C-alpha cells in the first residue's frame, strides 16, 4: 500500500515538474526579449495581442532555449521585424512556435536548431520591396522540423545544410550563407502537413519511389526520391519555389517561378534530370542547379532576375536553346566539369555568360548581345568556343587565368570597348574569327600567351599586343 501511495504521489508531482514556468508577454508589459533572457528550457512564453516591433523588441529575437512561444488564448500577436533582420533566430533544439503572426522584411525564422515545431503560424513578407534575398523560414542544417497548419504569404521555406564554417571549404555552398548539405536527412527528416503558400498547398515528399507533384502547389519540395515529375506548376512569389534534392531523376516541364526571394527552381545533389520550358521572371536566382550531374536545361528562360541560369559543381550537363534577358548574371557556371552551352542567348544582361574555374566547356552557337559589362567572361576556364555571335556588348569576350582556349569562327560585332580581351592565356588557338564595328579596340593581348596561335582572323582594328609576352605566334 505504501508503494502504491508513493507512486501516486510521484505521478501527481511529475507533471508539475515537467511543466516549466509560464511567462506572460505583451506590448504593454514584459517583452519577448526580456522573457527569453529570464526563461529556461521547458518554459512557456504566452504572447498577448498587439504588435511586437523594433520599438519593443531587439531583433533578431534569439531563442537559445527549448521553450514554447505561443499566442495567449484568444489573442493574435504580430511579430513585425525591421528590414535586414530576422524576426526569430532559433538556435536551440526543441523550440515550439504556436499561433504566431510573423511579418518580416528579410527573414521570418532563421532556424539552426533541430526539432523545431511550428503550428498554426502565419509567416508573411511585410513589403514586396524587400523581396530580393528574403525568406520565410531558412532551415540551416536542421533535422526533424514539424510544420502543421501554417500559412505563408509572399514567401516559403528554404532548406539547406549548416551555416558556413571552416569545415565548409571545398564543399558546395548556398548563397554565401549555408552549405548545400551533405546529409540527405537535412531535407528528408521533416514533417510538413496542412500548410499553404500563397493560398495554395505546400507539397512535400520525401524518400518515395515515384512522385508527381500537383499543378496547384504553391511550393514543391521533393527530396530523396527515385523519380520526380512536375508539369505546369506555378510556384511564383515563394522564397524557394521548388526544392529538389537528393533525387535520382527529375523531370520539370512548362513550370514557372516568378518573383521568388531566393531561388525559383532549385535542384541539388540530383543524379539526372531535364528542365524543359521552365521560366522565371523577377526572381533572385531564376533556375539554380548545384552539386548534380547529367542535368539538361532546355528551352528555359529567365528575365529581369538577379541571376538567370546557374550551374555550380555540375558535371556532364548542358544548357540548350535557353534565353536570358535583362539579368545581372545571365548564365553562371562555376567549379563544374564536362558541361555544354548550345544555342543559348544572353540579351541585355550585365555579364551574359560568366564562367568561373569550370572544367573544359563547349560553347557553340550561342549569342551574347547588349551586355553592359561583358558578353562572355572566361575566368580560368578552358573552352572550345566556336560559331558564337557577340554583338553590341561593352566587352564581347574576356578570357584570363591561364586556361587553354580554342576560339574559332565567331562573330565579334559592335563591341563598344573591346571585342576580345586576352590575359595570360597559353597554348590557345584563334582561327576564323571576324571583328567588325569595334569601338576602341578589336583585340587586346596582355601577359603570357606562350604557345598560342593566331590564324586567319579578320580584324577591323589592329591587334593591340604591346603588353603581350613572347611566344604569341601570328600566322596569316
Q: Which positions does each model-derived feature cover?
A:
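N-terminal extracellular ligand-recognition/capping segment immediately after the signal peptide
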Residues: 27-36, 41-68, 74-84, 104, ...
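Parallel beta-helix/beta-solenoid
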Residues: 40, 64-66, 74, 83, ...
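Short glycine/acidic-rich loop motifs that flank beta-strands on beta-rich extracellular proteins
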Residues: 56-58, 74, 81-86, 90, ...
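Leucine-rich solenoid repeat scaffolds
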Residues: 152-197, 427-476
Amino acid at each position: 500500500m505504501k508503494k502504491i501511495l508513493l507512486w501516486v504521489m510521484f505521478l501527481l508531482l511529475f507533471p508539475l515538474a515537467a511543466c516549466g514556468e509560464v511567462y506572460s508577454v505583451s506590448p504593454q508589459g514584459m517583452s519577448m526579449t526580456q522573457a527569453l533572457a529570464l526563461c529556461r528550457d521547458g518554459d512557456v512564453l504566452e504572447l498577448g495581442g498587439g504588435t511586437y516591433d523594433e520599438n519593443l523588441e531587439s531583433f533578431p529575437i534569439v531563442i537559445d532555449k527549448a521553450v514554447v512561444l505561443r499566442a495567449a488564448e484568444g489573442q493574435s500577436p504580430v511579430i513585425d521585424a525591421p528590414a535586414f533582420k530576422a524576426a526569430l533566430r532559433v538556435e536551440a533544439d526543441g523550440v515550439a512556435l504556436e499561433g504566431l503572426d510573423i511579418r518580416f522584411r528579410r527573414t521570418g525564422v532563421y532556424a539552426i536548431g533541430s526539432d523545431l515545431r511550428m503550428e498554426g503560424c502565419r509567416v508573411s513578407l511585410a513589403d514586396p520591396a524587400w523581396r530580393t534575398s528574403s525568406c520565410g523560414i531558412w532551415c540551416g542544417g536542421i533535422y526533424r522540423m514539424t510544420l502543421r497548419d501554417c500559412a505563408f504569404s509572399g514567401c516559403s521555406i528554404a532548406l539547406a545544410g549548416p551555416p558556413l564554417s571552416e569545415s565548409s571549404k571545398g564543399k558546395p555552398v548556398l548563397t554565401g550563407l549555408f552549405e548545400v548539405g551533405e546529409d540527405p536527412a537535412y531535407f528528408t527528416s521533416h514533417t510538413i502537413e496542412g500548410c499553404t503558400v500563397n493560398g495554395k498547398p505546400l507539397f512535400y515528399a520525401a524518400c518515395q519511389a515515384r512522385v508527381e507533384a500537383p499543378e496547384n502547389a504553391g511550393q514543391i519540395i521533393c527530396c530523396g526520391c527515385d523519380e520526380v515529375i512536375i508539369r505546369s506548376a506555378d510556384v511564383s512569389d515563394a522564397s524557394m519555389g521548388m526544392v529538389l534534392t537528393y533525387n535520382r531523376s527529375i523531370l520539370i516541364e512548362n513550370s514557372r517561378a516568378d518573383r521568388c526571394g531566393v531561388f525559383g527552381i532549385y535542384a541539388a545533389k540530383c543524379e539526372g534530370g531535364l528542365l524543359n520550358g521552365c521560366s522565371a521572371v523577377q526572381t533572385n536566382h531564376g533556375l539554380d542547379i548545384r552539386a548534380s550531374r547529367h542535368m539538361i536545361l532546355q528551352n528555359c528562360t529567365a528575365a529581369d532576375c538577379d541571376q538567370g541560369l546557374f550551374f555550380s559543381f555540375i558535371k556532364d550537363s548542358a544548357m540548350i536553346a535557353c534565353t536570358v534577358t535583362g539579368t545581372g548574371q545571365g548564365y553562371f557556371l562555376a567549379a563544374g566539369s564536362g558541361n555544354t552551352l548550345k544555342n543559348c542567348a544572353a540579351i541585355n544582361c550585365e555579364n551574359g555568360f560568366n564562367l568561373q574555374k569550370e572544367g573544359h566547356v563547349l560553347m557553340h552557337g550561342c549569342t551574347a548581345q547588349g551586355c553592359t559589362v561583358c558578353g562572355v567572361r572566361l575566368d580560368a576556364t578552358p573552352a572550345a568556343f566556336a560559331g558564337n555571335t557577340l554583338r553590341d556588348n561593352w566587352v564581347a569576350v574576356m578570357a584570363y587565368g591561364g586556361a587553354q582556349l580554342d576560339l574559332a569562327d565567331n562573330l565579334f560585332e559592335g563591341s563598344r570597348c573591346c571585342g576580345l580581351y586576352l590575359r595570360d592565356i597559353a597554348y590557345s588557338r584563334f582561327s576564323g574569327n571576324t571583328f567588325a564595328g569595334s569601338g576602341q579596340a578589336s583585340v587586346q593581348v596582355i601577359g603570357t600567351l606562350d604557345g598560342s596561335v593566331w590564324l586567319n582572323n579578320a580584324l577591323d582594328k589592329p591587334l593591340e599586343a604591346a603588353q603581350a609576352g613572347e611566344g604569341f605566334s601570328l600566322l596569316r
